[in-house]
Amino acid sequence: MSLTELLVAMFIFTVVSMGISIFFANIWKSKYNELEMGKSLLIASQAVNNMKKSIRQAGQADSGAYLISSASNFDFVFYSDIDNDNDMEKIRYYLDGSEIKMEKAEPILGTNPTYPDVYEAPVTIAKDIANTETEPIFSYFDNDYDPLATPTSAYPIRLIKITLYVNTDPNKISDVSISSLVYIRNVNN
């Protein structure tokens, strides 16, 4: 084997090795992106289920306030006993950048219960949320299932639609949506 043949063989081996390495690296990266998207979807789905549970159980505040405090496209504040202590916590779900966060405020009990002006530290319940101004997280409906404009008065709200668009890489992957309807049980008609 001459030196020229040896160099050609080494060159071919190097090119083939690099090609195989690049091929497997791209497959790994693709599978990693799919795995990340799957994890984000699972977390978002769990967040929607937890939101549904707490919204469904909304009730009158310990202070006597109506069960819904405020309702807009990306922010929903209501009262619910999410920790099963027989006290109605003030709950706020909202979009902060690409994260859904939850805040709660425990009632200050006494002869005239009140709620503090400041919530406890926010908890991130979902990440990689890609909702835009035209894709609200919260949509509201009345008794006849007619949509309500937002922000809306809390009193006609009977049904809430929660929609999350999830995307781990907005430059490459299209949004995947998770949507659910919640009927508030404790609303007097």
Regions found by a protein language model. Name each.
Residues 46-67, 127-147:
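Generic detector of solvent-exposed, compositionally biased contiguous segments
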Residues 35, 71, 102-106, 154-157:
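Calcium-binding acidic motifs and repeat modules
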Residues 42, 55-82:
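Short, glycine/small-hydrophobic-rich surface segments
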